[in-house]
A protein has these predicted regions:
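Short glycine-cluster motifs
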Residues: 18-98, 102-105, 114
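Short, small-residue-enriched loops and turns at beta-alpha junctions
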Residues: 107-110, 137-139
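Short Asp/Glu-rich motifs
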Residues: 58, 111, 142
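Peripheral docking tails and interdomain loops at the edges
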Residues: 1-30, 36-46, 117-209
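Short glycine/threonine-rich loop-to-helix capping motif typified by GTGT followed
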Residues: 110-117
Length: 210
C-alpha cells in the first residue's frame, strides 16, 4: 500500500523524463551508497558527472567529500548553503540526469522543513523530479508531511521503493504510443440523434439510440 501511494505521487508530480540517468546528492556518504546499491540492483543508470559538472563539484565540496555520483556533500553542507546551491545547480544542469534523489537522514522541525522549502525552487527551475529518500525512523517527522504536501517534491520512505518507482516511471514513458481506435460505424448518426442538453430519457429510449 505504501508503494502504491508513493509511486502514485511520483507519477502525479513528475514530468516526462528528460534523461535516464539518476543523480544522487547527499550529505551522508552511507546514504549515498545505499541509494546507489538499490539503483544498481534495478539496472538504473547512474552516469558520472560531465567534466564541467565535476569541476563545479570539486571546487565546492571539501576534500573528504565525493564530487562524483553519488555526490557526497558531507555534513559541512549544513553550514555552507552556497555549497549546496552550487552543487544542486551543477547536477541538475547536467543533461545526463533526468531526476535527482536527495536522501534526508535526520528530522528536525526547523532545519528539515527549511531544507524541503529550499529544494522546491530547483524542481520548478529545471523541470526534473526531486525525490526525497526519507531515512529517519520517525516516518511522519517534521519535513516528511511537508514534502508530501507540495507539488515540487516527491517523498519515499523506502530506498528500494524509491528506485523501483523511478524504474516504473521510465518504463511508462518508454511505451510506444498506440494509435487511437477507429470510431465505431454509425457513431456520427448516433451522436446527431441525441436529444438536446438537459433532456431526460427513459431506459428504452436511451438504448434505442445506440
Amino acid at each position: 500500500f505504501d508503494a502504491l501511494l508513493e509511486t502514485a505521487s511520483l507519477f502525479a508530480k513528475a514530468p516526462k523524463p528528460t534523461a535516464k540517468g539518476v543523480a544522487i546528492v547527499t550529505p551522508s556518504g552511507g546514504a549515498g551508497i545505499m541509494a546507489a546499491d538499490h539503483a544498481e540492483a534495478l539496472g538504473l543508470p547512474m552516469p558520472q558527472p560531465l567534466p564541467a559538472t565535476e569541476a563545479v563539484l570539486r571546487s565546492s565540496i571539501p576534500d573528504f567529500g565525493a564530487p562524483r555520483n553519488p555526490c557526497d556533500l558531507t555534513a559541512q553542507v549544513a553550514a555552507n548553503p552556497q555549497m549546496f546551491d552550487a552543487c544542486m545547480e551543477a547536477m541538475l544542469s547536467d543533461p545526463q540526469y533526468g531526476c535527482l534523489v536527495v536522501p534526508q537522514v535526520y528530522s528536525h522541525f526547523q532545519t528539515t522543513v527549511g531544507r524541503m522549502e529550499q529544494l522546491r525552487p530547483y524542481a520548478a527551475k529545471f523541470g526534473k523530479p526531486l525525490i526525497i529518500a526519507w531515512i529517519p525512523e520517525q516516518l511522519e517527522g517534521p519535513g516528511a508531511c511537508h514534502a508530501e504536501s507540495v507539488p515540487e517534491l516527491i517523498l519515499f520512505r523506502s530506498m528500494r521503493r524509491l528506485m523501483q518507482g523511478i524504474r516504473l516511471w521510465h518504463d511508462y514513458h518508454d511505451r510506444v504510443e498506440e494509435a487511437p481506435p477507429a470510431p465505431p460505424a454509425g457513431l456520427d448518426a448516433a451522436l446527431a440523434a441525441l436529444p438536446g442538453k438537459g433532456a431526460v430519457l427513459m431506459e428504452a429510449e436511451a438504448k434505442a439510440l445506440f
